[in-house]
């Protein structure tokens, strides 16, 4: 029966079991554009059943603009346009009903007119294979088209699908279009009186050229009911454009699959989420050209808790951004010592914005073509090392499983990667062989100028076989080791700050980063695993540092594995032990392989098998290194050891780095004549996309890594190993660049009362009562290298703004550039930092005299003390830190050293950023009956007693060492190592005056 219904007063969603057929609201018989009401998306009732004579309203998208790939569990078709047209349905037996007559009312200008046709055939089969989506409470049917449809003509913003909870918005302008089939809906009525039967074969339609992935995605549509095919076929025969071949880089939009309800009812009508509203949406590479209105452009970011899962957001809420721009200060000059630090350009992440959850975004340039799928872009050739050829640079490694599956992936971040400035990481490994550090390491760290002097944002340095003898370990426990001091001195002028360090005997790992990246490096943790002597000795094993950089979990693992040719299986077991034992706390990645990116490097001690010494040297001399690759144990193990699955390494285009004669570039000429081998290696692994969501709730395939150089440095000859360095470029699909704390300070302090700091904290920040704000000089070396500090108060001053003031006594005198930083006890790093500002305060006589005395004492130090104790480090303890220099980022300087028994009852409650520098109340030694002091109890100039003196047998008793406590004596109290010579003989720490004099002149004194 054909005809037009004039009743449309009832709203959709009410049952149409009796009376006239209800018309969807907004569908009229005038020429005005029709409007599809959002109530079409109401969820279906689970137990509703249609009457035997109840007609069903079928909606089928027609035209190339409505073509979408069907998911594996059932299609969810978005309404392509609010322009419905009439199309009859066919019965399952293949009998077609009469096609609706085309009249003047169905002209393209009269968009809202409908022609309703009823069919007395049997009802279509249930949606068991995803062919029909029919809410039983509405009687709506949206069958998929039988057979593949034409590809989309364009992918503009008007095709942005909407989520279930959002209403559809009509397009900005609806004008006449050449055909109705291009953007219309096919509506038909089907009675449901007969049991379902298999549908008939649909009419043949020209099929576009599809990729294998798209054909598999469209396979369920081939079993759709014939009722949908007639409506679209009749429309296509009239005015559908001819299909064109579909390029490999273009694909249908893939809405996520949705299963049926628990009672077996078909799923409700569900469209793809709106990219402007859904947090799970990611930019797609289908669009060939970007426009300011294109939904694939990046959006402002929003920091989410680490345990937030994916899901559609509520209306009005912010969506997490894909990317926000980050600044990169000007590159330092090519000089070894760069000029003074200029103020870095203002960054959206460091400047106040209108909303704390948003920062402005920079869309891609209009003339920048988006990359096609299946192509990989190599990094800039300028970053290649001198001894590598451009054609040998490795291709970028992405987290996607393969490039062929990217076309069907529901998310791709390639357009975002294209606009990401990148984050450069340099990794260095060096077995120093207990040697003293060289004078200069700028070439090793790529800091001596050139194209890549400004390329590093983070530097990881792994050392092995650092001198760990007992006397060296005692000095290193009190002061920073020489190697750490060397790298801090070299990197400090280039704005690098020590983020974290960990040491296990001779294995050390140092992690540096530019100071302006510190607010975006969080959750810093370290761990170590011993594997020497069955796990009881730390000469072999691994140390690691993990952190979150811009919301991405990174882990750096420095290992020293067993040596010798026949210990390959033992090296494998040790590596497995390290991976299994090292665990981290917190909601982030717990195991090493759970991180988004893992760097594994160190002296892995893999050797070259089969070939003898003469052939190996011949291959090296004749530059035939490829013959040695095949017999390298690590290369062979990559194919056989499951533990190495996913680890990648750049080409070994440099000569083996072991073993050399110390001081030369000649391989071992000793009696052992060790065979050269690539023992020092750098590998990386990106978390597989199938590893589940990341700790932040986003998908794991969101990181791209490119290795720009992988080389050895033959110019360093202090060890029998050559150092190896690699440079990487990381491109993030999104950046969490919202600082947790924002500091506000005046541009210049010329009076002490101007030393006021105001700061604001985000609601997600977990603050601690041990947080503090430090004042640093420009070029500071680590987070505890401050000039002054003040505890962070948490009393609300103005809304969410807090304020602290530095005391006049703690402020530095004179003129200089300084930086303020908020140190988080929970994150173990500066999470808020300011731009450089100036302090110009008049110097006082007290400050000048203190400086003169400090300089005099420094001149009295011997050469060994100056070599061990570098003078540029600041004390991590706030007490008296402005007057004295410390030698370690973990311990304070010792103007006077007191050894006394440790007592829990006598521990003071002094709060300090460094727990090692807590000071105890001074207790004078017992006095004899005649009032004279015994031993070293002579009082100093200020009346305070001197340090204790123990009998000669005390230093020889090692059992007493754990009960001793190292403590800082008040420098103003005159506590010195030199008591009266007369009282030294019976109770001196050393059995002879010469021994005491040596201790006074040694490395522990000022």
Swiss-Prot record:
The 5 Arg-Ser-Xaa-Ser-Xaa-Xaa (RSXSXX) motifs may constitute binding sites for the 14-3-3 protein. PANTHER family: INOSITOL 5-PHOSPHATASE (PTHR11200), PHOSPHATIDYLINOSITOL 4,5-BISPHOSPHATE 5-PHOSPHATASE A (PTHR11200:SF127). It is found in: Cytoplasm. GO terms for molecular function: inositol trisphosphate phosphatase activity; inositol-1,3,4,5-tetrakisphosphate 5-phosphatase activity; inositol-1,4,5-trisphosphate 5-phosphatase activity; phosphatidylinositol-3,4,5-trisphosphate 5-phosphatase activity; phosphatidylinositol-4,5-bisphosphate 5-phosphatase activity; SH3 domain binding. It is an enzyme of class 3 (hydrolase). This is Phosphatidylinositol 4,5-bisphosphate 5-phosphatase A. Residues 27-41, 94-112, 256-273 have a biased composition (Polar residues). Its EC number is 3.1.3.36, 3.1.3.56. Residues 196-209, 337-347 have a biased composition (Pro residues). A motif (RSXSXX motif 5) lies at residues 911-916. The keyword Transmembrane helix does not apply. InterPro entries: Endo/exonu/phosph_ase_sf, IP5, IPPc, SKICH. Residues 425-728 are annotated as: Catalytic. It comes from the Eukaryota. Residues 1-416, 844-1006 are annotated as: Disordered. The modification Asymmetric dimethylarginine is found at residues 56, 76, 83. A motif (RSXSXX motif 3) lies at residues 874-879. GO terms for biological process: inositol phosphate metabolic process; negative regulation of microtubule polymerization; negative regulation of neuron projection development; phosphatidylinositol biosynthetic process; phosphatidylinositol dephosphorylation. One of its GO terms (cellular component) is ruffle. A motif (RSXSXX motif 1) lies at residues 102-107. The keyword Cytoplasm applies. It catalyses: 1D-myo-inositol 1,4,5-trisphosphate + H2O = 1D-myo-inositol 1,4-bisphosphate + phosphate; 1D-myo-inositol 1,3,4,5-tetrakisphosphate + H2O = 1D-myo-inositol 1,3,4-trisphosphate + phosphate; a 1,2-diacyl-sn-glycero-3-phospho-(1D-myo-inositol-4,5-bisphosphate) + H2O = a 1,2-diacyl-sn-glycero-3-phospho-(1D-myo-inositol 4-phosphate) + phosphate. Residues 180-193, 210-234, 348-360, 398-409, 844-858, 927-946 have a biased composition (Low complexity). Keywords: Cytoplasm, Hydrolase, Methylation, Phosphoprotein, Repeat, SH3-binding. A motif (RSXSXX motif 2) lies at residues 350-355.
